Structures are given as structure tokens and as C-alpha cells.
From Swiss-Prot:
One of its GO terms (biological process) is protein refolding. Keywords: Chaperone, Cytoplasm, Disulfide bond, Redox-active center, Zinc. PANTHER family: 33 KDA CHAPERONIN (PTHR30111:SF1). This is 33 kDa chaperonin. It comes from Vibrio vulnificus (strain YJ016).
Length: 291
């Protein structure tokens, strides 16, 4: 069974490239960090697939963040991924969300922000309205406006054998492509036939053969996708010592401990008075850096 993997492929005779992402554990880690409503779990899965497909286009070390903001019950949904396919995500909501809520039911009047941050170089940010019925159409609109390349995206979420899965495919005309409009439409029609179970379970080579067995498809080396939030007890301790000391000891006096919660993975780090004393002692003993 295919899981937590990104595959890139090329239609050699048609100047069209493709991507296939298949996620289970990475998706499950994100939606298990909070008691997300079913529709919001689905939206996070779609956003996760979208971000992974986008990070596959990175030709440098860096990260991409796709963020949805709106005035509906869901005020924020965000997924961050990097060129190594380390991903994390979180959403914020208020009130009841129906199981069959749509993108617009959840976000209301909103927009999508795509932020590309190279480790070296300038940060880029693009903002698009939530135009279209779903995230597929919003993202296709972004590609056509920003890259001016014909792009089609398929995103699916659901359960297989009792576990949550998210998967997606992308096909896009190459910038120097010589293929015809009919070629691209033909590939669209073939990809439209893909079934959820195939996307969730089949290895890339088998799935691509089922869809495109009459085409010359070159499949590149796969890349693993992994949930990684970046939190740690050490980072939490470092954050505590940046806060006013009196404020920290006031919290200790009233609550008995200072706690920091990671929204991405759901872990809570607690520090009692002896822990906090040790943090400040270690901070005081560190050599000062002169600027």
C-alpha cells in the first residue's frame, strides 16, 4: 500500500508533467492533534495535499505555506511544508460545523495566502480570493494566474480500512511544452477516471499504468512525506526565559507550573518552579554575545 509519499512523473511525448501524493499517517497526525469537526478534517487534508503538490515544485531549499483565512466559523487553516517534504498544519474554528459543510460554509468570505520562503533569497507572497467551488479550483486559478500554465488538480480525502487518507494528482503543461490542447484534455479525461481506493492504496507505478497505459510515462524517484512540527521541551524552555521573570513566577504562584502547548502536534510542556529556576540559571550562565 502506498503511503506518505510524493511521486513526480513526466509524459515524455506530450510535454506535460505530473505529481502524485498519497498520505495517511502524516495526515492522521495533523487531524489527531485537536478534536476537529469532520468537514474541517477534510479541509485540512485537502490543504495538506495542495501544499505537498506545491512544495514539489521548489527548486531550492525553503518552504511553502498555504493559509486560508475567512470570516466564517473557520478563521484560519494553514499547512506548512518544505523542500524535504516535512509538513505540519493547524486550524482554528468556533461553533458548530456541519459534517457536509463546504469550503465556503466554513471560510465565509475569505482568501488564500501562498507564501514561498527560500532559505536564501527573497520571500514571495501571493493572495487569491476563494473563487470556485472547492480548493482544487482555487489552486488551479492560482497556477493559471501566477505561472500562466494550464494545470489540473484532483484532491481526495476519505477513509480506507478505518483510517483517514488524503491523496491528490496534478498535471501541468511544461513551460517550453510543445504538446497540443487536445493532448492535455486527453490526459484530463484519463485522470478523471481515478477512484479514491486506487489513489489511497495503489503504488505509483501501478496507478499510473492503470490510468495512462497508452502513454510514455517516466516516473522519478519518490520522496517521503513526514509530519514534523519542530516543537521540543528545549525550545519551550528557551521561550519561557524570554518572558518577564515576574510574570513567570506569578503564573507559578497561581497555577503551580508554567505550560506551553504546541498547536501543531498537541503536546503540552509543563515546567514547575525547580524547572524554571534551572532555566534561568542556565540562561544566566550562558556567555553574552557582543554585537
Amino acid at each position: 500500500m502506498a503511503s506518505n509519499v510524493l511521486n513526480r512523473y513526466l509524459f515524455e511525448d506530450l510535454s506535460v508533467r505530473g505529481e502524485l501524493v498519497q498520505l495517511d499517517e502524516a495526515y492522521q497526525r495533523i487531524i489527531s492533534s485537536k478534536d476537529y469537526p469532520a468537514a474541517l478534517q477534510k479541509l485540512l487534508g485537502e490543504l495538506l495535499v495542495s501544499t505537498t503538490l506545491l512544495t514539489a515544485t521548489l527548486k531550492f531549499e525553503g518552504s511553502i505555506t498555504i493559509q486560508l483565512q475567512g470570516d466564517g466559523p473557520v478563521s484560519l487553516a494553514v499547512i506548512n511544508g518544505d523542500n524535504e517534504q516535512k509538513i505540519r498544519g493547524v486550524a482554528r474554528w468556533e461553533g458548530h460545523i456541519a459534517d457536509d459543510a463546504t469550503l465556503h460554509d466554513m471560510m465565509g468570505k475569505g482568501y488564500m495566502v501562498i507564501t514561498i520562503e527560500p532559505k536564501k533569497g527573497e520571500r514571495y507572497q501571493g493572495i487569491v480570493g476563494l473563487e470556485g467551488d472547492n480548493l482544487e479550483q482555487v489552486l488551479e486559478g492560482y497556477f493559471e494566474r501566477s505561472e500562466q500554465l494550464k494545470t489540473r488538480i484532483w484532491i481526495r480525502t476519505g477513509e480506507h480500512e478505518g483510517k483517514a487518507h488524503a491523496a491528490g494528482m496534478l498535471i501541468q503543461v511544461m513551460p517550453d511544452g510543445t504538446g497540443s490542447e487536445n493532448d492535455f484534455e486527453h490526459l484530463e479525461q484519463l485522470t478523471n477516471t481515478v477512484k479514491n481506493e486506487e489513489l489511497f492504496t495503489l503504488p505509483a507505478n501501478e496507478l499510473l499504468y492503470r490510468l495512462y497505459n497508452q502513454e510514455q510515462v517516466r516516473l522519478f524517484e519518490p520522496q517521503n512525506v513526514e509530519f514534523r512540527c519542530g516543537c521540543s521541551r528545549e525550545r519551550s524552555g528557551a521561550a519561557i526565559v524570554t518572558v518577564d521573570k515576574n510574570e513567570i513566577y506569578d503564573i507559578l504562584a497561581s497555577d503551580g507550573s508554567v505550560s506551553l502547548h504546541c498547536d501543531y502536534c498537541g503536546t503540552t510542556y509543563s515546567f514547575d518552579e525547580s524547572d524554571v529556576n534551572k532555566l534561568y540559571e542556565e540562561a544566566a550562565s550562558e556567555p553574552k554575545t557582543l554585537h
